[in-house]
């Protein structure tokens, strides 16, 4: 899920004179692996009968608690001004949409397909930001969007989709749109604050919605055994770790390199789904997956313009 956040205004930059950039690279790659592990573990729990609402409620509750503890331990601010606090909590709605859409899609389509569709979120952000922030749509980015959607058509296959597959595709697309909404709304309403504090509030807002849907839904805590609960907690820890590792690495190598490296997330997810869930990609679908990832990388390339990433877009973010 997870592909949630970004810095929403506070200037982030690579630490000057950083002599060990490989540590930053390793942290961002570990972050990508954390996000990937979280969705794969949650998908395993879904296949064992755990409901989507149950899974998201537990995962994001654990992630929120872990992020809160890390913020306090690091002496970083937790509180926000009233205006920014309400805006960040409001972003929890988009967190909720992303969680329901992304994880819900794995009930109907393979995880490897869901992550590719979900990862088209930056493309939606690209076109929306043209009107909200006058972000230029360059030829490179238009070509990248075309490549990504061409690859997506290959990855989904040329055959007609079943009703359940259509539900999965639409669910993943809703998650991608939720991600784009998070990025766009956050960059317009929240500025000059610690991005991790924004993440904390938005995750908390999303968690509250997940819990409400869990307790007022038709089948609360369905399929939640002790083993499944441990798995979901592990998934939540992976999310929390991923956020902490990402921003630690970003400070060392800057947002441009961090955004590029985070594009390894779908690669990790597809690989993990193959080994853990037994998912397989045909030759044509493998090419399609490669094209999607290539398109997203091109969108985030420095020469294409300001990085448009699912987790790192923000005004004021720059690299020294």
Protein language model annotation of sequence segments:
Residues 15-16, 63-81, 149-163, 205-228, ...:
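Membrane-interface helix-cap regions at the ends of transmembrane helices
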Residues 54-65, 95, 102-136, 175, ...:
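Specific alpha-helical transmembrane segments that line the substrate/conduction pathway
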Residues 34-39, 68-114, 118, 154, ...:
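Specific transmembrane alpha-helical segments of multi-pass solute transporters/efflux pumps
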Residues 22-30, 53-69, 85-86, 140-150, ...:
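Hydrophobic alpha-helical transmembrane segments of multi-pass integral membrane proteins
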Residues 2-7, 67, 120, 137-157, ...:
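Hydrophobic transmembrane alpha-helices of multi-pass small-molecule transport proteins
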Residues 57-58, 114-120, 185-208, 239-275:
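Helix-helix packing/entry segments at the starts of transmembrane helices
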Residues 45, 55, 59, 105, ...:
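Hydrophobic/aromatic residues within transmembrane alpha-helices
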Residues 1-54, 58, 93, 101, ...:
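Glycine-/small-residue-enriched transmembrane alpha-helix faces in small-molecule transporters
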């Amino acid at each position: 899920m997870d592909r949630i956040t970004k810095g929403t205004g506070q200037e982030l930059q690579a630490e000057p004179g950083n002599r060990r950039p490989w540590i930053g690279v390793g942290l961002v790659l570990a972050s990508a692996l954390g996000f990937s592990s979280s969705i794969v573990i949650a998908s395993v729990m879904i296949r064992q009968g755990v409901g989507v609402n149950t899974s998201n409620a537990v995962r994001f509750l654990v992630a929120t608690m872990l992020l809160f503890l890390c913020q306090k331990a690091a002496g970083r601010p937790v509180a926000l001004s009233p205006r920014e606090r309400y805006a960040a909590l409001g972003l929890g709605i988009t967190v909720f949409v992303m969680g329901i859409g992304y994880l819900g899609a794995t009930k109907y389509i393979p995880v490897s397909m869901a992550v590719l569709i979900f990862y088209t979120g930056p493309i939606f952000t690209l076109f929306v930001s043209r009107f909200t922030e006058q972000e230029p749509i360059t030829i490179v980015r238009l070509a990248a969007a075309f490549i990504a959607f061409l690859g997506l058509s290959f990855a989904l296959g040329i055959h007609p989709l079943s009703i359940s597959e259509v539900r999965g595709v639409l669910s993943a697309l809703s998650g991608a749109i939720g991600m784009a909404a998070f990025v766009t709304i956050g960059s317009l309403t929240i500025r000059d604050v610690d991005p991790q504090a924004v993440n904390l509030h938005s995750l908390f807002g999303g968690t509250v919605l997940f819990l409400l849907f869990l307790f007022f839904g038709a089948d609360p805590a369905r399929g939640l055994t002790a083993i499944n609960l441990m798995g979901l907690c592990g998934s939540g820890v992976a999310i929390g770790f991923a956020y902490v590792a990402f921003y630690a690495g970003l400070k060392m190598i800057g947002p441009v390199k961090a955004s590029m490296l985070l594009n390894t997330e779908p690669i990790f997810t597809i690989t993990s789904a193959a080994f853990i869930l037994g998912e397989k990609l045909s030759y044509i679908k493998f090419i399609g997956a490669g094209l999607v990832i290539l398109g997203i990388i091109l969108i985030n390339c420095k020469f294409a313009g300001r990085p448009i990433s699912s987790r790192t877009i923000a005004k004021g973010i720059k690299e020294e």
